[in-house]
Swiss-Prot record:
Belongs to the bacterial flagellin family. InterPro entries: Flagellin (IPR001492), Flagellin_C (IPR046358), Flagellin_C_sub2 (IPR042187), Flagellin_hook_IN_motif (IPR010810), Flagellin_N (IPR001029). This is Flagellin D. GO terms for cellular component: bacterial-type flagellum; extracellular region. Residues 103-129, 310-339 form a coiled coil.
Length: 377
């Protein structure tokens, strides 16, 4: 083998392997210290792009879960307040039934009305003050808002919160009263025992309901018969013997038309709008009508509470799905980008050994040209 002084090929070879081992060692240290096997585009350009897209999706899913939880919190806040609204309406109904009893004097009914007025004020206070993050929930101003429960645009769900004030038309309906009162001697006559209600239901469908009373029935029995034949309207009788018909806005849209022989005998008058805000139990007739008004309001509140319950259940399922997606997205991102510590530790040990070996060989290779000096000896 030739002895060269100007060119030390062995040293150059050792230097090349040392550089490679050092670079590999630095790469392993970077991966182990950062926890990522992709730290720049040069490590894996395609993998970096995919992992970044997955990271964006994961962050979006995290935000979507927070949004969904906010939606649940709003629904829970509203539904909790509406639970108290239900309690108030139930108490008002109890008081109305109490006032309708004939054992009460005028002064006692006035006292009952005072409590109903106070309860009505509290019902409205709850509707006006229930809020979440500064947004009023139950006074009609919340209306409909969207909740972003997905990682991409367009993945939103709408939530509607209805007006729970007592003067809301859906917290009542329309009252119709017969022009003439019927005393205890009045009876349903043969050939004039039918009354037909023509109306539109809440979905806008035409409804025609015919009730045939029995010959000889008195006015109280007529009211009982109507209530037994249909739930679209509620019938009662006031202290003057006048038939009262109430159509709740949660069931009937628009006015009710009356026809038939019995309707002609009763001579039903034009309707008057009534809500929980306007109920008056200082008379028997008013107390009877109040029960129907409050029943309509209770159905309205209960229906909306059911909607909020369904909304909460839907969002709970949405959160479970988002968590599942996020788990799989992060698992995929981890497989692409995260460091395999067992594998990388092995690579680091290998590069350290090669680095040490290359350094030792390089030191020996640098001594080779000294052999030329011995020839000059």
């Amino acid at each position: 083998m030739a002895v060269n002084v100007n060119t030390n090929v062995a040293a150059m070879t050792a230097q090349r392997y040392l550089t490679g081992a050092t670079n590999a060692q630095q790469t392993s240290m970077e991966r182990l210290s950062s926890g990522f096997k992709i730290n720049s585009a040069k490590d894996d350009a395609a993998g970096l792009q995919i992992s970044n897209r997955l990271n964006v999706q994961s962050r979006g899913l995290d935000v979507a879960v927070r949004n969904a939880n906010d939606g649940i919190s709003i629904a829970q806040t509203a539904e909790g307040a509406m639970n108290e609204t239900t309690n108030i309406l139930q108490r008002m109904r109890d008081l109305s039934l109490q006032s309708a009893n004939g054992s009460n004097s005028k002064s006692e009914r006035v006292a009952i009305q005072e409590e109903i007025t106070a309860l009505n004020d509290e019902l409205n206070r709850i509707a006006e003050t229930t809020s979440f993050g500064g947004n009023k929930l139950l006074n009609g101003t919340f209306s409909t808002k969207s909740f972003q429960i997905g990682a991409d645009n367009g993945e939103a769900v709408m939530l509607t919160l209805k007006d729970m004030r007592s003067d809301n038309r859906m917290m009542g309906g329309t009252s119709y009263v017969a022009a003439e009162g019927k005393d205890k001697d009045w009876k349903v006559q043969a050939g004039a025992n039918d009354i037909t209600f023509t109306l539109k239901d809440i979905d806008g469908n035409d409804q025609t309901i015919t009730v045939n009373a029995k010959e000889g029935d008195d006015i109280e029995e007529v009211a009982t018969y109507i209530n037994g034949q249909t739930d679209m309207v509620k019938a009662s009788v006031n202290e003057k013997g006048q038939l009262q018909i109430f159509a709740g806005n949660n069931k009937v849209t628009g006015d009710v038309a009356f026809s038939g022989g019995l309707a002609g005998a009763l001579n039903m008058q034009a309707g008057t709008a009534e809500t929980v805000d306007t109920i008056d139990v200082t008379s028997v007739g008013g107390a009877q009508q109040s029960v129907a008004v409050i029943d309509s309001a209770l159905k309205y509140v209960d229906s909306h509470r059911a909607e909020l319950g369904a909304f909460q259940n839907r969002f709970n399922h949405a959160i479970s799905n988002l968590d599942n997606i996020n788990e799989n997205v992060n698992a995929s991102k981890s497989r692409i980008k995260d460091t395999d510590f067992a594998k990388e530790t092995t690579a680091l040990t290998k590069s350290q050994i090669l680095s040490q070996a290359s350094s030792s060989v390089l030191a020996q290779a640098k001594q080779a040209p000294n052999a030329a000096l011995s020839l000059l000896g």
